[in-house]
Amino acid sequence: MTGKPVQVVAAGGIYNGRTVAAALMLGASAVWVGTRFILTDEAGAPKAHQEAVRTAGHDDNIRTIIFTGRPLRVRNNKYIENWEENRAAEIKELTAKGVIPVEHDFEILGDEIDDETMDNARPFLMGKAAAVVNEKKSAKAVVDELVTDAVKCIHNGERMTAKL
């Protein structure tokens, strides 16, 4: 609409130099790295959140709307699983009225809410990359590694160019 080139920022699954290089080679102007930075020394994430990311496997996170009414990918647990598998119609009904499902639970349970429900009703946000992010580093080390490895991948790709 401005006549200027559109800038594309790639996001989702960006966690190492190979994924940065792939996004750039596919035409992205930049990348957005999310989950990888949860497991850094400087992250403001609580230790429990960092541990949830560090120990996540490929099937340990789920996309849900129970926390905000908008899709989030979070570490799965029995509380979330119960909503998604047994209370899907209730999610639809509540969100159609603008009611956040988790807040609805808190209102209904009131002072009767138990510690386990409280603990499991806390979302540990993470993307699919959490399954391969398992080492805590400084943010600088992460950025340095992303850039260094991306440059290596791009240079390796240049060597593969056919000479016509």
Where are the model-predicted features located?
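Conserved active-site-proximal phosphate/metal-binding subdomains
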Residues: 1-9, 14-164
